[in-house]
A protein has these predicted regions:
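A short, glycine/small-residue-rich beta-strand->loop->alpha-helix junction that serves as a flexible
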Residues: 6-17
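Conserved catalytic-core segment of nucleotide-activated headgroup transferases in glycan assembly
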Residues: 17, 110, 114-180
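Extended catalytic core of nucleotide-activated donor transferases of GT-like folds
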Residues: 33, 39-103
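Short alpha-helical segment that forms part of, or immediately flanks, the ligand-binding pocket
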Residues: 180, 203-207, 221-222
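Aromatic "clamp/platform" in nucleotide-sugar-dependent glycosyltransferases that forms part
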Residues: 194
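Short hydrophobic beta-strand element within catalytic cores of glycosyltransferases
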Residues: 211-214
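Conserved acidic donor-binding segment of nucleotide-sugar-dependent glycosyltransferases
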Residues: 226-237, 244-250
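A charged, aromatic-enriched C-terminal amphipathic alpha-helix characteristic of glycosyltransferases
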Residues: 236, 247-286
């Protein structure tokens, strides 16, 4: 049996990525359940996955079981358990180095930058991909001109006065069904966090038909292509650039279309097909 250990399911992209991955494994007839502290389930996105209490799962684990985890700080606790370990890598800082040095741990990655980082430690990994929830995909909703969306918990917007006169929608502490509707009706999306591991909110905004203005990211370089499907700028220049974009939206419609096209590479169908191929090739045999 596979048990995916996740922390308290607060609003963090890694939580949703874990649930999405587990859901696809179940579609592929792989036995997997989620284990969280006290068995708490997420309230900010929809999921039909069974969720168990970590406290109840841990005493019953055997060497035949597998524990999947993505939070590096869970490693010290989980390595003491009899189950085999699988690390679902969603970030590449020094906290994951002890995990990479443990050859008993199987490694899964979600994007190319993480895959490359893992290989620097002479470890093989399987890139299982990442996907945007279906409800974010644009389907012809009307866009409010001169409007943009932000996620204030991701960072502080410098020089906000440069965006006076434009309509701002703040996505904060809400269900993703509401967030997706905001993005579908917003003309632009202003990312605030520099050097994100991947930057899933920007990709969700691209799927929603937004013109994205973003600081540089790490893993996000595989989908954020400056000048082709988005704008990438220094943090201190983000407000001014967003205002320029919103003043001349029609001139940038090609970015909106290219962004939407790019986002379909991360549609759930694409990730599911990727996983199917990995199982057929034997790359994920340790999950069976």
């Amino acid at each position: 049996m596979n048990f995916y250990f996740l922390p308290e399911p607060t609003i963090h992209g890694g939580i949703k990525v874990g649930f999405q991955f587990a859901a696809m494994l179940r579609q592929l007839e792989i036995d997997v359940v989620i284990a969280t502290p006290n068995g708490s389930a997420p309230q900010w996105f929809s999921s039909q996955l069974p969720v168990l209490s970590q406290e109840k799962v841990i005493p019953n684990l055997t060497p035949k079981d597998r524990v999947i985890f993505s939070l590096p700080y869970d490693y010290d606790k989980l390595k003491k358990l009899p189950a085999r370990m699988i690390f679902h890598c969603q970030g590449t800082d020094s906290a994951i180095i002890p995990i990479l040095q443990d050859e008993k741990v199987e490694i899964l990655t979600c994007w190319t930058q993480a895959e490359d980082f893992v290989s620097e430690f002479l470890r093989d990994s399987e890139n299982v991909g990442i996907s945007v929830s279906r409800n974010f995909y644009y389907s012809g909703e009307s866009k409010l001109s001169r409007s943009y969306a932000t996620m204030p918990r991701r960072g502080v917007l410098p020089f906000p006065e440069k965006l006076n006169g434009f309509k701002e929608y703040q996505i904060d502490n809400m269900h993703e069904d509401v967030a997706s509707q905001i993005l579908k009706h917003s003309s632009g999306f202003l990312a605030l966090s520099e050097n994100e591991w991947f930057g899933l909110p920007s990709l969700e905004a691209m799927a929603s038909g937004c013109i994205v203005v973003s600081p540089k990211t790490l893993g996000g370089v595989e989908y954020l292509i400056a000048g082709e499907n988005c704008f990438v700028e220094k943090v201190e220049n983000l407000s001014e650039l967003m205002s320029e974009v919103l003043r001349s939206e029609q001139k940038h419609q090609h970015l909106r279309q290219r962004a939407l096209e790019m986002s379909y590479r991360y549609h759930p169908r694409a990730q599911f097909k990727k996983l199917q191929k990995l199982f057929i090739s034997g790359g994920l045999k340790f999950l069976r």
